């Protein structure tokens, strides 16, 4: 999207619009119920913080930080996992979180105070199920963690940033449950890759 924007539109399309176009292509053309986070990060590049409270007008703020200056590099590992047949698994994540929001008569979880969520936990478990509850716990914790991560980078406290990122990873694994697809026993490629990375690093 960014390349096409520069080649054919004189870079006049905003980064948010490039991300929204990418999301539309995935949702409509490829039939994948994705959000805007990956598309926004790709459109902007480098490190960014994104506020999706207004999904039509996300607030995108670059975070000026050089990983190399701390002796680190961001690496992508080929775990061998194939998510071609996991559309329903990925769709279940926002679907279950929105189901909890709907319990409160709202569209998205950001419209519900965390205290109200925990106050109604027994009823939510009965209505929406435990996995939905766990995913909402991740949602609230992660939304609290992100500003701390950004602040740590801006303060130059890279060790604190890494610690918070590690917490995010564990939360994704434990609460969001996006590492091992439901029912997969023999093939858990991403989990194996995470285990080996933790062992060697």
Predicted segments, located by residue:
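Gly/Ser-rich oxyanion-binding loop with an adjacent helix/lid
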Residues: 1-67, 199
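C-terminal nucleotide
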Residues: 49-201
